[in-house]
Amino acid sequence: MREPLSPSAARDLIRLAAVDGKVAFASHAREELAKDGITIDRAVEVLRGGVVEPAEFEHGSWRYRVRAATIYVVVAFRTEDHVVVVTAWRRKR
């Protein structure tokens, strides 16, 4: 897979991974989800239906930020059909 992907291409692959249950959560992501009161299920819902922003290269990999309402979930691809959530947060109003 050649990265960075366009937001629409990333969206399609992220949604497939979410539907197929091929989403892993880094320990940092789990901590951030808990801190902001976001469940794993809600994070997966964001991946299934959120808006994917353009990729950013951070810490040696391409990251894709997915947003829905006030929740942001950032993923990196392990493979074309498997993503890892690296962090997440709830935007403060």
Give residue spans per PLM region.
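Ribonuclease/tRNase effector modules and their secretory precursors
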Residues: 1-93
